[in-house]
Curated annotation (Swiss-Prot):
Protein name according to UniProt: APC membrane recruitment protein 3
UniProt entry keywords in alphabetical sequence: Cell membrane, Lipid-binding, Membrane, Wnt signaling pathway
Biased composition (Polar residues): 362-384, 615-629, 719-730
InterPro entries, A to Z: AMER
Compositionally biased tracts (Basic and acidic residues): 598-609
Gene Ontology cellular-component terms listed: plasma membrane
Lineage, highest ranks first: Eukaryota, Metazoa, Chordata, Craniata, Vertebrata
Organism: Homo sapiens
Gene symbol of the encoding locus: AMER3
Function description: Regulator of the canonical Wnt signaling pathway. Acts by specifically binding phosphatidylinositol 4,5-bisphosphate (PtdIns(4,5)P2), translocating to the cell membrane.
Length: 861
């Protein structure tokens, strides 16, 4: 600020002094007058030709100053007058004598010497701008800031040399004046006011000699055009800041070339050159340091730091996202790279920040955000870290950048290259320069130019079913296009980071949720695959018992009936289907029809053996609705539509471990099954009177029973439980549904193959026991048999005995083929007994039968 004022008043003083040029004719006339000196009212000597209006204001001021000094002590004599006015007048006259020397040269054609410099009085005088006070407005700060010892630097030497030349020629001028007959007043005449006045300007004891007269003559003369450049050069050299730091190299921190106008003096001969230099200096290179380097202004430095910070953040975000989501982003967004670059070329022309000086736009300083310093030519400057170096990017590089087709013109200066080390550390050279992204424009939304490369995807872009993409391209919605992908540096970057993390997290969570796809369960009633294939489909609601899986490889009965379906699944080897509709969900026809006649008798015998095998049956029989897949080597129709109401123990066992619907798991029954098989192997089938515990468990019984019950509903189970005695357990043919758990049970039984019992002997013994023992049917059972049809007497052709599920006595539970009321199967008790015995024997006896399930060892034992 002080500098501005200093240059301003220097310029104004020069202009004012130039406004009133002197008249050379008047000066010549003054020399030809009767006396060159005249006394003004104050007593100061003046040329006669010089008029008040023609004299410059500075001369008038100088004149007034000594007048006041003379009036202070009018009677004090020359010594008093000299003591009062000597210092200010002499100092001021020194400057005027310098200016007047050139003026006299133009007027007379000769260089006139000056008394200011070499000579007894002038040798001690130097220009001191602290005493400019009478000539121009007093600015103390400027006066103090200009040291006297620095005045004679550089160009002032030229001025002094010219003045010395003037000093050598001054005697010639005075000789010419004396030849013209000009009479000079004697120095010692006290009456001559001129002599008295002349002594006032000279040291005591000296009269106004030739030097003094020449000094007084040139005191009030003004600058001429010829010497105007010299004075201007002197003033510029004194006031210019460039001269101050030329030797020391210390830059004036507050100096700004763009803000300090140069002296607009167009009168001098060098004015065109200086005007051109002024234009160059007005190109805003920023503040100067040592006339070479540019300092970063606070506004630009702050904004550039902010911009570079967010650029680095965005770059790190893009790199992280490229590493994590690169495979998904490279495809869809790779095509937008060129288009986004071309679009940003137009957007980059917009101003970055409102605080930026509009004039600074003319200086295309570099913004190579994507170009590391290694690609730039080495800087020649000596700038320290933190100072912007005007030579590092240079105008040439900026022009090249502006001319390059793909990259926009640089719009913001880069303070330094301090961050290039980090950039080169993380920059992948294979990717090439990233190029300016729309993030460089603080106020421009990216939605104008499309999504930028590597922009984090919006969390809103996740859609149902798109988890496998993990990061699908965002749809053209408001959030992804206008807001989340805009180029707002501050909050936008944070949103992008959070959004990317959330998107990745959501993708991982959704991927984990999918897990292995569950297999579709087979439709109810779908027959199970043969046991050899072991591909039995799983019934949705029923855990099919392992017995079905135990069906023999030769022709295991596939009895995988659904709970609601009342179908008889015939084994491929079966000769005939059960006559009745067999609503029991799995009445498996696995044998010949001979066994069907023995069903009633078998029920009775089974009634005896139910108590023993209730536990085993609960473990071994799958409570699912599949009918027992007891398959003998010879096919025999097994009326497994067992609708017999089991005693509570049996039902509880069925519902417990084996029936999933009633709270059990087949896996829990496997250990029990192994124990039961061991017990069965140890059992010895005895005579008729033997308690039911003597009978080995029938393993096919559960199928028909539970299939029927499921078909009829859980309430029927309750009724059957109530009707059956706890001692009698339904040892239905231990039906096993075709399920993976059945296969597990089958494997378990295979492992227990060592429990084999001779099927023939066992069957014979069982048959004998069955034949010998009378039918032990309770009255209730007899009534049921009568109601159904002939129990024992009828052969295979006997009509189907219809057993009401509610009316079944525990004794007659077992294998009542007529368990299905609607489609009862005619069965004779002996045949049922035979089948029961055969199945019981084979359960422990034949490994393949064990594997296939509780199958009959013989069709008839």
């Amino acid at each position: 600020m002080e500098l501005k004022r200093g240059k301003t008043f220097i310029k104004s003083s020069l202009q004012v002094s130039h406004e009133k040029p002197p008249d050379p004719a008047a000066v010549a006339a003054a020399r030809e007058g009767t006396g060159p000196w005249s006394v003004l009212p104050g007593g100061q000597q003046r040329p006669h030709s010089e008029k008040g209006p023609q004299a410059s204001p500075s001369a008038q001021e100088y004149d007034r100053c000594p007048n006041k000094g003379a009036q202070l002590d009018p009677k004090g004599g020359p010594a008093a007058l000299c003591g009062a006015t000597f210092k200010p007048v002499r100092k001021c006259k020194t400057h005027d004598s310098m200016s007047g020397a050139g003026r006299a040269t133009a007027a007379t054609g000769q260089l006139v010497g000056s008394a200011s410099f070499p000579g007894s009085p002038g040798s001690r005088r130097m220009i001191d701008y602290r005493h400019f006070v009478p000539q121009m407005p007093f600015v103390p700060a400027v006066a103090k800031s200009i040291p006297r010892k620095r005045i004679s630097l550089k160009r002032p030497k030229k001025c002094f040399r010219n003045l010395f030349h003037i000093r050598r020629n001054k005697t010639e001028d005075l000789a010419s004046l004396a030849a013209e007959g000009k009479s000079l007043p004697s120095p010692g005449d006290p009456s001559d006011p001129g002599g008295r006045r002349s002594k006032a300007f000279l040291p005591p004891g000296e009269g106004p000699g030739l030097d003094g007269l020449c000094q007084d003559l040139l005191d009030s003369e003004l600058l001429a055009d010829a010497s105007f450049g010299l004075c201007r050069a002197l003033c510029e050299d004194v006031a210019s800041l460039q001269s101050f730091d030329s030797l020391t190299g210390c830059g004036e921190v507050f100096a700004d070339e763009s803000s300090v106008p140069s002296l607009e003096l167009n009168e001098g001969p060098e004015s065109p050159t200086q005007a051109a230099q002024g234009l160059e200096s007005k190109v805003p290179r920023g503040p100067l340091q040592g006339s070479v380097e540019q300092l970063a202004s606070p506004a630009q430095n702050e904004a550039s730091d902010f911009t570079r910070f967010w650029d680095s953040v965005n770059r790190s975000v893009r790199q992280q996202q490229r590493a994590l989501l690169g495979p998904w982003l490279s495809g869809p967004q790779g095509t937008d790279r060129d288009q986004s670059r071309l679009d940003t070329a137009g957007l980059a022309e917009l101003p970055l920040c409102p605080c930026r000086d509009p004039r600074s736009g003319s200086k295309a300083s570099s913004i190579d955000t994507g170009t590391p310093k290694s690609e730039q030519p080495e800087s020649v400057s000596t700038s320290d870290e933190g100072y912007y170096d005007s030579f590092s990017p240079g105008l040439e590089e900026d022009k090249k950048e502006a001319e390059s087709p793909g990259t926009p013109a640089a719009t913001f200066p880069r303070d330094s290259y301090s961050g290039d080390a980090l950039y080169e550390l993380f920059h992948d050279p294979s990717e090439g320069p990233l190029g300016p992204s729309p993030d460089d424009d603080l106020c421009v939304s990216e939605s104008l130019s499309g999504p930028a490369l590597g922009t984090p995807l919006s969390i809103c872009s996740f859609r149902v079913g798109a988890e496998e993409n993990l990061a699908p391209a965002p749809g053209p919605d408001l959030l992804s296009q206008g807001f989340l992908q805009s180029s707002w540096k501050g909050k936008e970057c944070l949103l992008k980071l959070c959004d990317t993390e959330l998107a990745i997290t959501m993708g991982i969570v959704s991927w984990l949720r999918r897990g292995p796809t569950p297999r579709a369960p087979p439709t109810p009633g779908q027959p199970a695959a043969p046991p050899g294939s072991q591909g039995a489909p799983r019934a949705p609601t029923e855990k099919l018992g392992g017995r079905e899986g135990l069906a023999s490889d030769a022709g295991g009965a596939t009895v995988c009936s659904a709970p609601s379906r009342q179908e008889l699944w015939a084994h491929p080897g079966t000769t005939g289907l059960l006559a009745g509709e067999s609503k029991a969900l799995g009445g498996a026809t696995q044998g010949t029809g001979t066994l069907s006649r023995d069903a009633s008798r078998e029920e009775e015998t089974r009634g005896h053996s139910e108590g023993l095998f209730s536990s085993m049956e609960s473990a071994a029989t799958s409570t699912t609705d599949t009918s027992g897949k007891n398959k003998a080597p010879v096919p025999s129709t097994w009326p497994c539509s067992q609708k017999e109401p089991g005693p509570p123990g049996v039902l509880g066992c069925f519902r417990g471990p084996w029936r999933p619907g009633h709270g059990g798991d087949t896996l829990d029954a496997e250990p029990m099954l192994a124990g039961c098989v061991a017990r069965v192997a140890a059992l010895k089938i005895s005579s008729n009177e033997q308690p039911p515990a003597a009978w080995p468990p029938r393993q096919d019984m559960g199928s028909g029973l539970f299939g029927q019950r499921w078909a009829r509903g859980p309430d029927m189970l309750e009724q059957k439980q109530s009707s059956s005695s706890p001692s009698m357990t339904t040892i239905h043919g231990l039906p096993y549904s075709a399920s993976t758990q059945d296969q597990r049970c089958r494997d378990r039984v295979q492992d227990l193959s060592w429990l084999r019992v001779e099927p023939t002997g066992l069957g014979v013994q069982a048959w004998a026991s069955v034949e010998d023992q009378p039918l032990q049917l309770s009255t209730e059972a007899v009534e049921q048999v009568a109601h159904g049809s002939q129990l024992d007497s009828e052969p295979r052709s006997a009509p189907a005995a219809r057993w009401s599920s509610q009316g079944h006595h525990p004794e007659s539970l077992g294998l009542t083929l007529n368990s299905q009321q609607e489609g009862g199967v005619s069965a004779s008790a002996p045949e049922c007994r035979c089948s029961l015995l055969a199945r019981e024997g084979l359960l422990c006896g034949q490994p393949e039968v064990g594997a296939s399930g509780p199958a009959m060892a013989e069709p008839h034992l």
